[in-house]
Amino acid sequence: MQPRVLLVAALLVLLASARALEAEDPSLLGLMQGYMQHATKTAQDTLTSVQESQVAQRARDWMTDGFSSLKDYWSTFKGKFSGFWDSASEVQPTPASDAS
């Protein structure tokens, strides 16, 4: 064979294989779109996680403040009436000795 015919045949084989690979490989635009979709989903998931974390933290703070206020209220209530409860327990008559 002549070198020119061999060179043209090799070039045609390379072009045919490149065309076949191009059909199999996604285009650069497709790769970028896939990457951007993945990045967008990751960013949305992260933002949702942070927002849920902030909501949970606010709920915990609200519950802690509520229980703290309730504890303070109970301590104040108990402090005001502890003298009354102490004097009421001292004045209780004994049922057996008073009946005789």
UniProtKB/Swiss-Prot annotation:
Post-translation: what modifications? The most abundant glycoforms are characterized by an O-linked disaccharide galactose linked to N-acetylgalactosamine (Gal-GalNAc), further modified with up to 3 sialic acid residues. Less abundant glycoforms are characterized by more complex and fucosylated glycan moieties. O-glycosylated on Thr-94 with a core 1 or possibly core 8 glycan.
**Into which family does the record put it?**
Belongs to the apolipoprotein C3 family.
Show the InterPro entries listed in the entry: Apo-CIII, Apo_CIII_sf
Metal-binding listed as a keyword: no
What's the protein called, per UniProt? Apolipoprotein C-III
A GO term from the CC aspect: intermediate-density lipoprotein particle
- In this protein, the residues bearing a glycan are T94
Q: Which UniProt keywords apply?
A: Chylomicron, Glycoprotein, Lipid degradation, Lipid metabolism, Lipid transport, Secreted, Sialic acid, Signal, Transport, VLDL
| Region annotated Lipid-binding, chain positions | 68-100
- Subcellular locations according to the entry: Secreted
Q: Kindly state a single biological-process term from the GO annotations of this entry.
A: negative regulation of triglyceride catabolic process
Record bears the keyword Kinase: no
Give one Pfam family: Apo-CIII
User: Hey, what's the signal peptide range on this chain?
Assistant: 1-20
Q: Cross-referenced PANTHER family, in alphabetical order?
A: APOLIPOPROTEIN C-III
One GO MF term:
lipase inhibitor activity
Function (record text)? Component of triglyceride-rich very low density lipoproteins (VLDL) and high density lipoproteins (HDL) in plasma. Plays a multifaceted role in triglyceride homeostasis. Intracellularly, promotes hepatic very low density lipoprotein 1 (VLDL1) assembly and secretion; extracellularly, attenuates hydrolysis and clearance of triglyceride-rich lipoproteins (TRLs). Impairs the lipolysis of TRLs by inhibiting lipoprotein lipase and the hepatic uptake of TRLs by remnant receptors.
Per the UniProt record, the site (May interact with the LDL receptor) maps to K41
| Chain ranges passing through the membrane | none
